[in-house]
């Protein structure tokens, strides 16, 4: 059985870049775009790579900045300076 890991953000210009990075690094990810928020689902695992977000934003990015835009997450969280990973493990 596959469970989706997901993350939801407030909808704004910075999160547009973050979502683009997530979709690039998670080929199975699906985006649910709503008026005030954007949610990204990914089967089993969702990873946000600092380097990809920096590439999309055109500036340095600290993964702690995600907290400013974050609404909710689903999955076990594993975080380093370079990756923010949500997953469901059996």
For every predicted segment, state its role.
Residues 1-21, 25, 36-56:
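Conserved N-terminal glycine/acidic-rich loop preference
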Residues 21, 30-31:
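Short, conserved, surface-exposed binding loops centered on an aromatic residue
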Residues 26-29, 61:
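A common structural junction motif
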Residues 34-37, 41-90:
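Helix-rich interaction surfaces within compact, conserved domain-sized segments
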């Amino acid at each position: 059985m596959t469970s989706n890991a997901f993350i939801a953000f407030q909808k704004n210009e910075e999160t547009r870049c973050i979502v683009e990075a997530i979709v690039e690094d998670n080929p199975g990810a699906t985006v649910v775009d709503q008026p005030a928020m954007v949610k990204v689902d990914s089967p089993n695992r969702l990873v946000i790579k600092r380097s990809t977000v920096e590439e999309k934003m055109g500036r340095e990015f600290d993964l702690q900045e995600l907290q400013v835009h974050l609404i909710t997450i689903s999955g076990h969280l594993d975080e380093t300076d370079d990756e923010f990973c949500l997953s469901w493990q059996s």
